[in-house]
């Protein structure tokens, strides 16, 4: 029987902080921590922003070196704090395992298989993997050159800079039953300017029909929640990839409890094949 992981979930940076207070939102960490259990893989952004806030609080000013250097330095500082808070709130009877990934861990078959083994063993060993992109050691120009070289060899190359993509790629690798993308809105809207147009379900009987529906919705997707984010259009692209591989996809607001989103008892968008 094929091994499967129950859930791959992802939460974005801005959902983990209180911008008005320049601080971490500990309530979010608490809610998530109490809901996470073995059989789940949690992809968490937040290291860079949390590192920035921590540096600002300790020194009274932000770093003023180059963009790549700032991202590297903030991410290195924030990752430790990110993991500290997950460990603080996850049930102490469960192990917590940090997994930092880059694109080559999914584009190289041997490295991909190595990660698959790590994730499946975690479920068996009562451990919860917390995954993030390894920003402190990822240099933009080198990464671009590596990706260009890979794309010359084959078409199906993943970048995984966006943790929505990272979550979708992991969901495919571990044959996840559900992919949950937590974001700053309730889901996908027919009209992004009108909250009443939330689309509760995007489904079809065939892969071709589902892809057609998603492509139509992508035409109305504009903007993103913050600079550097890829927005709803990219989120739909990654969700489609998972749905076509047989994973049930849920996109919903991070303010809701994880279990309520999984039960679809709160506003959200569900994507999948009938």
What spans do the regions from the language model cover?
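C-terminal catalytic "cap/lid" subdomain
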Residues: 1-274
């Amino acid at each position: 029987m094929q091994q499967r992981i129950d859930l791959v979930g992802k939460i974005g940076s801005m959902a983990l902080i209180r911008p008005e207070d320049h601080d971490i939102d500990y309530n979010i960490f608490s809610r998530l921590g109490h809901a996470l259990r073995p059989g789940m893989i949690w992809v968490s952004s937040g290291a860079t922003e949390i590192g920035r806030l921590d540096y600002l609080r300790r020194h009274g000013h932000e770093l003023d070196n180059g963009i790549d250097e700032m991202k590297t330095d903030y991410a290195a500082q924030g990752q430790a704090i990110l993991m500290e808070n997950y460990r603080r709130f996850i049930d102490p009877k469960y192990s917590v395992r940090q997994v930092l990934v880059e694109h080559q861990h999914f584009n190289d078959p041997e490295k991909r298989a190595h990660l698959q083994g790590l994730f499946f063993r975690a479920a068996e060993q009562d451990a919860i993997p917390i995954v993030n992109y390894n920003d402190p050691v990822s240099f933009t120009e080198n990464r671009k050159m590596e990706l260009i070289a890979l794309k010359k060899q084959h078409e199906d190359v993943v970048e995984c800079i966006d943790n929505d993509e990272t979550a979708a790629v992991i969901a495919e690798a571990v044959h996840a039953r559900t992919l949950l993308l937590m974001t700053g809105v309730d889901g996908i809207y027919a009209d992004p300017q009108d909250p009443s147009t939330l689309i509760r379900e995007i489904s079809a009987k065939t892969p071709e029909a589902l892809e057609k529906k998603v492509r139509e919705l992508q035409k109305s997707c504009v903007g993103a929640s913050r600079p550097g984010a890829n927005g709803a259009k990219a989120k739909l692209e990654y969700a489609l990839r998972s749905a076509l591989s047989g994973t049930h996809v849920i996109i919903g607001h991070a303010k809701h409890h994880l279990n309520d989103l999984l039960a679809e008892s709160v506003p959200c968008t569900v994507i999948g094949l009938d």
